[in-house]
Regions:
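N-terminal onset of structured domains
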Residues: 2-117, 133-135, 139-169
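Short strand-edge motifs at loop-to-beta-strand transitions and within beta-strands
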Residues: 120-128
Length: 169
């Protein structure tokens, strides 16, 4: 299982990220303070129908909850749009999304955005392909037991981690 522990410390301290030491300079701290998720939605990628959306993101909250219609589990592909703002330049924005079921890592995906202009607001769309129907767990079993952990990076430097517990309706 992949776990991330982030301690936001002064620029003179060092921290470990996935086993590699890194210098936590002032720019990294400024990136963390200036990065914000504005809104997100998820659509059925084949029809474009919005299945879920939220404009309320508290990036400082340890874990959020989302109520998502169970019909989303029937979509072959889900398109996720994420709108974010950054005060600082980010040279290589990427995210790692981990799907955690009852404390165990089920899946992990990596997405790469690239360069982010300072003082900009951007919309990033990703398409996520569903597992085969016979491999899917039922909504009743998943609901409340799945946490989506998304960690944003500039290259190897962590910017922010957001955890969302999923409840299927």
């Amino acid at each position: 299982m992949v776990s991330f522990a982030f301690v936001f410390t002064s620029p003179t301290k060092r921290q470990r990220v996935r086993g590699a030491a890194m210098d936590d300079g002032g720019h990294v701290q400024a990136m963390r303070e200036g990065f914000h998720i504005n809104w997100m939605n998820m659509r059925d990628a084949s029809t474009g129908q919005v299945m879920w959306e939220s404009g309320e993101w508290d990036c400082d909250q340890e874990e959020m909850e989302a109520q998502i219609p169970c019909e989303i589990l029937r979509c072959r592909q889900v398109s996720r749009e994420l709108n974010f703002s950054s005060v600082e330049v980010i040279t290589s924005l990427r995210l790692v999304q981990s799907v955690i079921f009852k404390g165990e890592l089920l899946e992990e995906w990596n997405f790469h955005f690239g360069f982010v202009i300072p003082n900009s607001t951007n919309t990033w769309q990703q398409t996520i392909e569903a597992a085969e129907e016979e491999e899917m767990l039922p909504a009743e079993l998943l609901s409340g037991n799945v946490v989506i952990e998304t960690t944003f990076f500039d290259g190897e430097y962590p910017i922010m981690t957001q955890r969302v517990r999923i409840w299927y309706l």
